[in-house]
Amino acid sequence: SRLEVCPAGCALSQDIALRISTHGGAALFIDYGKDRASGDSLRGIKHHQFVSPLQSPGRVDLSVDVDFASLKAAAEALKIDGLNVYGTVGQGDFLKQLGIETRLHALLTQPGITEEQAETLYLAYHRLTDEEEMGTVYRAMSMVSMPTGGEYEESPPAGF
């Protein structure tokens, strides 16, 4: 059994939480990863193909899944009043909540759009949202700082 830990990622998550709680605002994280630690996700990528991470040192891009659960736990461990962490949600659901289907329809019904342009738009939509493509592999998480004692309702940001 293997365990991946990213102390720098947890520290960065806490730094972002402190900054937005001090100055107000929100943060949005989108990347490929999991809602929990996944063990061994280290992989090499060369010419858009997965290869051994030890193949051709210095010439292979190294990549790991983001452990969103650790980032969320690190921010929540600070117990900051008014800081809320939302997600994760799959990229497909996130984009659909934001209206990607409405946007696609608007683009597809523009006067003068060619079949080739329409196909390109649909394929891009499919790649971003489909469960077999990037729709569930990529995840979204948000941190939002809401003033305490204000008139704001605690509700998740758009997409969550």
Range-by-range predicted roles:
Residues 1-160:
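Long, Lys/Arg- and hydrophobic-enriched amphipathic alpha-helices
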